[in-house]
Design a protein with these regions (language model features):
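FAD-binding FR-type
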Residues: 1-20, 32-36, 54, 82, ...
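Phosphate- and divalent-cation-binding pockets in alpha/beta enzyme and binding domains
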Residues: 10, 29, 122-123
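Short, flexible hinge/linker loops that cap or flank conserved catalytic cores
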Residues: 11-13, 40-42, 105
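Catalytic cysteine-centered active loop of the rhodanese-like fold, especially the PTP/DSP P-loop
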Residues: 19-22, 113
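Hydrophobic/small residue at the entry helix of a nucleotide-binding pocket
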Residues: 25-30, 119
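Short hydrophobic alpha-helical segments of the AMP-binding
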Residues: 36-37, 127
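Rossmann-like dinucleotide/flavin-binding elements
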Residues: 38-39, 153
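Reductase modules of NAD(P)H-dependent flavoproteins
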Residues: 45, 49-153
């Protein structure tokens, strides 16, 4: 059985700052959320944490720059590489994207998470452990789906 999107990953009305955490291809829904918010005139501050393995895995950087330039409040973008070796030229954050979350919780943000299940689970545990209310945490978990293969003759 194939099930369509349920449509529960959208920006809730609020003036609270946004903490957006994306892992890998989870950036795409986060960008869609930001584009819709920008079109609606949102004026919430944004911190966007984007986790990838290597620098070559970072994508949509021009789109993120354009969004940041048009955003009506502060916009802080932090790419984080989990696979950057000490001998690489990477000057940005290293480690797991979820390890940076505690640095951005001081203003009681609403957290939107999108990416692989292990990232979502880790982020939710961290956010709940920091006393962020559960109704301020929204997640779109990427899970593998197994579809039966058509029989071949």
């Amino acid at each position: 059985m194939v099930v369509g999107p349920e449509g529960d990953f959208y920006l809730r009305p609020s003036a609270a700052p946004l903490l957006l955490v994306a892992g890998g291809s989870g950036l795409a829904p986060i960008l869609a959320l930001l584009e819709e918010a920008l079109a609606a005139g949102a004026q919430r501050s944004v911190t966007l944490l984007f986790g990838a393995r290597e620098e070559r895995d970072l994508y949509a950087l021009d789109e993120i720059s354009a969004l940041a330039a048009q955003w009506r409040a502060s916009f802080h973008f932090v790419p984080v590489l989990s696979g950057a070796t000490s001998d690489s030229n990477w000057q940005g954050a290293r480690g797991l994207v979820t390890e940076l979350i505690p640095k951005f919780l001081e203003n009681g943000p609403h957290a939107y998470l999108c990416g692989p299940p292990v990232m979502i689970d880790s982020a939710v545990l961290m956010l709940r452990g920091s006393a962020l209310p559960c109704d301020h945490i929204y997640a779109d978990r990427f899970t593998p789906h197994h579809y039966p293969l058509a029989a071949t003759a």
